[in-house]
Amino acid sequence: MEEIQRYLQLKRSQQHNFLYPLIFQEYIYAFAHDRIFSRSFLSENTGYENKSSLLIVKRLITRMYQQNPFIIFPNDSTQNQFLGHNKNFYSQLISEGFAFIVEIPFFLRLISSLEGKKKKIVKSQNLRSIHSIFPFLEDSFSHLNFVLDILIPQPVHAEILVQTLRYWVKDASSLHLIRFLLNEYCNWNSLIFPKKASSSFSNSKRNQRNQRLFLFLYNSHVCEYESIFFFLRNQSSHLRSTYSRVLLERIYFYGKIEHLVNVVVKVKDFQANLWLVKEPCMHYVRYQRKSLLASKGTSLFMNKWKCFLVTFWQWHFALWFHPRRIYINQLSKNLLEFLGYLSSVQMNPSVVRSQILENSFLINNAIKKFDTLVPIIPLIASLANTKFCNVLGHPISKPVWADLSDSHIIDRFGRICSNLSHYHSGSSKKKSLYRIKYILRLSCARTLARKHKSTVRAFLKRLGSELLEEFLMSEEDVLFLTFPKASSTLRGVYKSRIWYLDILCISDLVNYK
């Protein structure tokens, strides 16, 4: 990255389009593939298993210099050919390198904005964890009333992504290449948002290789969505956003806001009508396609926000945004499904005895508490889709794992069980997890019994039930094995919700949507 940064500093004053020449540099592909060219990705092309991957990259760069790079061979069985070989292979190769290249200006911008803040960066490493969101929700959402449950729409056409990226990357050649790569993948919509767990996105190696480029394009698209929140926050509050300068550094943005005043609000003075969406206590959270906008305001206020966002997105992105994609939920009455949890704000009653002189009386207080539960029904449905149980939740064997050794089978089931228990450690009611552990335990036993052509009862009787006890260990047991000197009085604390700061992604079983 330092070599690329020096290259950009030298070339920035010489030419404006500084991204496109990096595509012709071999070391870019080394960076993109962690300097390892011998991975299966670079050697899966038919007829080139024994060739050096570096030669493939050199041949690709040489042919990109030619005037007519799109060579079609009619005698080949593949209908679409690109650069003399399979079109998908070289498109994947270019997209991997280009995905690394197009992230460089954003990386340099981030580094420049964080200079002199290294101590803050070290302290904020734990914020990378998904579980770091929930302590924020506990502190903030318990005092709020309504929340907008927003499903961010995906763009209906690839050109929308290119136009969005045009405000970030001032490089016409790179934008043309992005447009070409998107046109190469006609089913790019399903690559970003798979509708089913068995879709090509989750199983196909080709789609996994291009995931980085597509996710980068989609994230730039989402940043465009979120820009309106930063703008309204800075206009309607004295508290300025510290990251808005980096996020909103795009051409024509404030020109769009001026048109937004005339088209959406239909008034001349935008500042005088910010009361429509002005709220000093608003919180915004997003993960993947789902975002939450919580407020202390009334239902009428949230309806104004809903109409404002729908109209803004439809006009700004020229696509149809259905109002039903935004749900208005009252936190005290509705369950909020977010990040594999069912969340709500519950009233926790408490009684306080007070005594003044000879008179004593009771004071009933109701304290709002942010509650998180495990969605047991969707989780069982996810286990049924992966063939650990049937649709009713009855455990079944896993035939595809029957050829593995006993230790590998137990290790796989134990890893799944511990990951689910680890992720759902923040649930206020742990009884739902016991059913999931029971399904996985019995599924493991039936898989082992199927392998040894025996019954579950006979297998457990012969080897002992302790064989499956290891991966059924609870989180609090793991903590007390790690800290054996912990007092027994703390066991009640550990039985409550635990948020871990080492969870960087959601398991496929949890991400059942």
UniProtKB/Swiss-Prot annotation:
Residue runs in coiled coils:
none
| Record protein name field | Maturase K
Q: Which InterPro entries match?
A: Domain_X (IPR024937), Maturase_MatK (IPR002866), Maturase_MatK_N (IPR024942)
Cellular compartment(s): Plastid, Chloroplast
Picking any one GO biological process from the record gives: RNA splicing
Organism whose genome encodes this protein: Keckiella cordifolia
Q: What UniProt keywords are attached to this protein's entry?
A: Chloroplast, mRNA processing, Plastid, RNA-binding, tRNA processing
Q: Specify where it is mainly localized.
A: plastid
Origin: domain of life: Eukaryota
From the record, give the cysteines joined by S-S bonds: none
Q: Lineage of the source organism? A: Eukaryota, Viridiplantae, Streptophyta, Embryophyta, Tracheophyta
Decide whether keyword Transcription is in the record.
Answer: no
Q: Explain the purpose of this protein.
A: Usually encoded in the trnK tRNA gene intron. Probably assists in splicing its own and other chloroplast group II introns.
UniProt gene name: matK
The UniProt family comment states: Belongs to the intron maturase 2 family. MatK subfamily.
Q: Name one GO molecular function term.
A: RNA binding
What is one term from the GO cellular component aspect held by the record? chloroplast
